[in-house]
Regions:
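A short, small-residue-rich loop immediately preceding and capping a beta-strand
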Residues: 3-4, 23-62, 267-275, 454-467, ...
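Acidic-glycine-rich active-site phosphate/pyrophosphate-binding loop
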Residues: 1, 17-21, 410-429
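Glycine-rich, acidic loop regions that bind phosphate or pyrophosphate groups
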Residues: 59-109, 118-123, 127, 239-349, ...
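Thiamine diphosphate
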Residues: 58, 65-82, 89, 421-526
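Active-site nucleophile and cofactor-binding loops and adjacent substrate-binding regions
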Residues: 4-15, 30-37, 407-410, 430-443, ...
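Phosphate/pyrophosphate-binding active-site segments
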Residues: 171-177, 288-414
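Glycine-rich, anion-gripping cofactor-binding loops and their flanking helix/strand elements
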Residues: 40, 211-295, 425-455, 466-473
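Conformationally flexible catalytic loops at phosphate/diphosphate-handling active centers
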Residues: 110, 114-204
Length: 526
């Protein structure tokens, strides 16, 4: 059964669809008319491309004989998204000929296969978002020209069955039950030669794992990944979007951003990076300065803007770990280096808790025991800034139910989560639009993500909320669709960090250029 949402704002609709696909891992279709309508989808298409989210854009168009002649709502829509989509198909004029219907069905298959090139199944029980988004999924576009009369005639016999495969719904055909969608590709395994090469690089060396967005897609995978890393004495530096901070294992390093804030941080000789670089800019810069050997594990591309890739392994992180475990031969990294990272992480954990308390005192004027606080206390560590967001984020995380979703805006919101989301709190799905790191359509994306969870908490700053305030109008449509399905609408709690823009631009060199900075960069809201 297909669920249909109607939204009058194409930009908001596109990010809502992005959120639906991001959370479920299934392709979501975006339908629009011609003209500026599909142009409003462009930002979401760019985010889907860089975040590897399966999005199918179906645009209506005017017929060929009206193109280039000034006809209303008519522009050149052929390859409108250029190379930002995985596949573009220009459809013929709609007609009922069997060959045209067969082409349309084949085009639908091609679009789905291109949106999910890893072969993810589209039927019930399909793989979840992080798997789909780790196998080079992405947006696709089909453009449909229509001529008048535009009203379809649904009374035509066989309009929905024409051109179907003989295996669709056939009874008694061997294996037909499993042909509802593309078959799921088998897991990839490393060759023995690659396993030996990787093991040779990490054996006895100071090595660590940098786990980026979408490293693990379930709690079971996270446990498996942590066990593998510990068996190899590899500190597992866990980005907040990696799926690993639900664990409390000693080898899971959640405070690595603050560890890198000290000059004496444990310097690696080898880094194994899973997927995208982490949120922490300090981590990326410090590692680039030290230039260790870097092994990049990713299903499709290096995503290496620092040009540090020494060895690229094309597979998913979990298949990488399983392959190494299956290969014979010991390859433990330096045990002393592993212990050094665990100790440094534990020390930063206690400092973060003290900064959290300092933030709470600044916000409430009271200590945890209720005592009044006079004056500002100095932070214990220069690596951690005592911003008020810390106390808020910790309280939000404590109140967020286990198994629910925490969707974060970019800018200061995701950085606050990176600092104050302490490992082992509870299993959460933490998501964010990190493809282009922008604030566009964030409210709408959060609402789309929320349709996949019973409870979603959305953390955002004031700039981001204002930028997509119109997305809140979707709530009426969401409630109506839920009522039609006889189900309650999913719950979403919006937490606003009303922090006058968050101050992230104050970190730029231009911050010292007054009066231009306040007018052109910080754009204060007060």
């Amino acid at each position: 059964r297909m669920t249909v949402y109607v939204d009058i704002d194409e930009r908001s609709a596109s990010f809502f669809a992005l959120g639906l696909a991001k959370a479920s891992g299934r392709p979501v279709a975006l339908v629009c008319t011609s003209g500026t309508a599909l142009a409003n989808y462009y930002p979401a298409v760019l985010e889907a491309e860089t975040s590897r989210v399966p999005l199918i854009v179906l645009s209506g168009d005017r017929p060929p004989h009206l193109q280039g002649l000034g006809a209303p709502q008519t522009c050149d829509q052929v390859k409108a998204y250029s190379d930002h989509v995985r596949r573009f198909i220009q459809m013929p004029l709609a007609e009922g000929a069997p060959r045209a219907v067969a082409f349309a069905r084949q085009a639908a298959r091609e679009l789905v296969l291109s949106a999910l090139p890893g072969g993810s199944d589209t039927c019930e029980g399909a793989v979840v978002a992080s798997r789909a988004c780790s196998r080079m999924a992405g947006p696709v576009h089909a453009n449909f020209p229509f001529d008048e009369p535009l009203k379809p005639d649904f009374s035509v016999s066989g309009v929905f069955s024409a051109g179907r495969s003989a295996l669709d719904g056939a009874d008694g055909l061997a294996g037909s039950a499993g042909l509802a969608g593309p078959e799921l590709a088998a897991e990839s395994r490393l060759s023995a030669a690659t396993c030996d090469q990787v093991k040779g690089l990490i054996r006895g060396r100071c090595a660590l794992v940098l786990a980026g967005e979408g490293t693990c897609e379930s709690l079971e995978e996270a446990r498996e990944m942590a066990a593998w890393a510990k068996a190899y004495d590899l500190p597992l530096l866990a980005d907040p979007l990696s799926g690993l901070r639900s664990l409390s294992d000693d080898g899971v390093i959640d405070n690595y951003d603050n560890v890198f804030g000290h000059d004496d941080f444990p310097v690696p000789e080898v880094v194994i990076r899973f997927g995208r670089y982490p949120v922490s800019k300090r981590c990326v810069q410090k590692l680039a300065a030290k230039r260790p050997i870097e092994i990049v594990v990713d299903a499709g591309e290096t995503r290496d803007f620092n040009a540090m890739t020494d060895l690229f392994v094309a597979c998913s992180p979990i298949d990488f770990a399983r392959s190494l475990l299956a290969c014979a031969g010991d390859a433990r990294a330096s045990e002393e280096f592993f212990s050094a990272w665990c100790e440094a992480n534990a020390a930063e954990h206690s400092r973060i808790l003290s900064v959290e308390e300092d933030s709470r005192e600044r916000v409430t004027g009271k200590a945890a025991n209720g005592a009044e606080v006079v004056g500002d206390a100095e932070p214990e560590s220069a690596a951690v800034a005592p911003r008020p967001e810390g106390a808020y984020v910790r309280e939000i995380l404590k109140a967020t139910p286990a198994g629910s979703c925490l969707f974060s805006a970019n800018s200061m919101a995701i950085r606050a989560i990176d600092t104050f989301y302490v490992k082992g709190d509870k299993p959460l799905a933490v998501l964010c639009n990190r493809g282009l790191n922008g604030i566009d359509g964030t409210v709408s994306t959060a609402l789309g993500v929320a349709q996949h969870f019973e409870q979603t908490t959305f953390l955002t700053g004031d700039f981001t909320l204002q930028h997509d305030l119109g997305g809140l109008a979707l709530q009426r449509e969401i409630a109506q669709v839920a009522a039609e399905r006889g189900k309650p609408a999913p719950s979403i709690v919006v937490v606003l960090l009303n922090n006058n823009g968050g101050g992230i631009f104050e970190m730029l060199p231009q911050a010292s250029d007054e009066p231009y900075f306040a007018r052109l960069f910080s754009a204060p809201q007060d």
